[in-house]
Amino acid sequence: MAVSRVERLLRKVADALDAAGVPYAVVGGNAVAAWVMTVDEGAVRATKDVDVLLRRADLPTAAAALQRAGLVQHEVLGVTMFLDRRRPNPKTGAHVIFAGERVRAHSGHPAPDVTSAVRSTAGFLVVDLPVLIAMKLESFRRIDQVHIEDLMSVALIDEALAANLPDDLRARLREIQATPEQGRS
């Protein structure tokens, strides 16, 4: 039931932004799932929310489009998100990452621009694979490390891709490769 709720939210967000002509890219767990699905649908991991990359300048247009779709803009602990008007829950909403801005104060790299998006097989815009991997390595929380392992498990991370990562992110990838699934599942 939770998976279908997230899929409906993802589709609602993508359809509203596409219809309004707002540039965006799905990031986070749904982006990982979209890429993993291109190789092995059975290896897809569920996620509880939707993360979407937007340009800050596009936020008013995005907010209007999402409001028409039944999602209301909120700010929770400094995070911009869109929540279901009937059942607002920050844990299960659509969370915004702003393109070109640091996700956290200590982040070494800013979030990418939405121009890094490609159309997924499911029809929504998703951040390009190398950019997604860099974002996951930048964040480097436990779930991000698990997502990197998911991408490795279906051979979506190769040496050519790793070689193009910044040194600090390549070191994090090597750490995950050296200790797969130890305390991260």
Region locations from a protein language model:
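Compositionally biased terminal segments of proteins
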Residues: 1-185
